[in-house]
From Swiss-Prot:
Source superkingdom: Eukaryota
GO molecular function: G-quadruplex DNA binding
rRNA processing among keywords: yes
General function of this protein: Involved in ribosome biogenesis. Required for normal pre-rRNA processing in internal transcribed spacer 1 (ITS1). May be involved in the movements of the replication forks.
Disulfide pattern: none
Species this chain originates from: Saccharomyces cerevisiae (strain ATCC 204508 / S288c)
Subunit structure: Interacts with the 35S, 23S and 20S pre-rRNAs and with the U3 snoRNA.
Protein name from the UniProt record: Ribosome biogenesis protein SLX9
More info: Present with 3670 molecules/cell in log phase SD medium.
Induction entry: Transiently up-regulated during the initial 15 minutes of dough-fermentation.
Keyword set, alphabetical order: Nucleus, Ribosome biogenesis, rRNA processing
Location of this chain's protein in the cell: Nucleus, Nucleolus
Length: 210
């Protein structure tokens, strides 16, 4: 077999390059410096790119900034929840809500104090008008035996009666809400409540604690 000459192959390649790129191409196939790089369709590959580490760092920074922004949107208390899990935040907020709920025992004691203050004011006015008269009602207090036998209930606790809707599920909560609104409207229209609101509240609380 006769081997082909290398000179003929080189001449063919140089002739083909000269046809594609023009006369500025050298015989060895290297382009001249005046060749425009932007005309190359793959020129964007040579542009600087963002590395994987930089992408990961940017994502972490944006995530942390979003968390801080959400924490400061609410109250000033929420700003102290940075770096705390969502479950612990929910527990703390639930505890704060429980502390804000009205307590029946505190309301009863405040009503008793208000009643005692009214009695003291009335007694003092009577004593100023009648110094010689003795008011026996101010010194003698009748105590009901049922009131003495009442068990002490922790403040903030609510007695769950039988045959009542369960507040833990959605259906029971709706039923309880409807009952409470109906009872609230009934209380507002009650004549005893309109005449003496504190006395009516005191009696209702005593009945509920029995």
């Amino acid at each position: 077999m006769v081997a082909k000459k290398r000179n003929t192959l080189r001449s063919k390649v140089s002739a083909r390059n000269s046809q594609n790129f023009g006369p500025d191409v050298a015989n060895n196939g290297i382009l001249d410096e005046s060749y425009d790089i932007e005309s190359d369709p793959r020129a964007f590959l040579h542009q600087p790119k963002e590395t994987k580490k930089e992408k990961l760092l940017n994502r972490q920074n944006t995530f942390l900034s979003n968390l801080k922004g959400k924490s400061t949107l609410n109250d000033g208390i929420a700003a102290n929840f940075d770096g705390i899990s969502k479950s612990s935040i929910r527990r703390r907020k639930r505890k704060l809500r429980e502390e804000l709920k009205p307590r029946m025992q505190d309301l009863l004691t405040s009503l008793e104090q208000e009643k005692d203050l009214r009695g003291i004011i009335e007694n003092s006015s009577k004593d100023m008008n009648n110094d010689d008269d003795i008011d026996m009602d101010s010194k003698i207090r009748f105590v009901d035996t049922k009131e003495m036998n009442l068990k002490k209930i922790e403040p903030g606790s609510v007695r769950i009666k039988k045959n009542q809707p369960n507040i833990r599920n959605q259906k029971g909560a709706k039923a309880l809400a409807a009952n409470e609104t109906a009872r609230f409207n009934q209380v507002l229209t009650n004549q005893d409540f309109q005449k003496n609101p504190f006395g009516a509240l005191r009696e209702v609380i005593k009945l509920q604690k029995q």
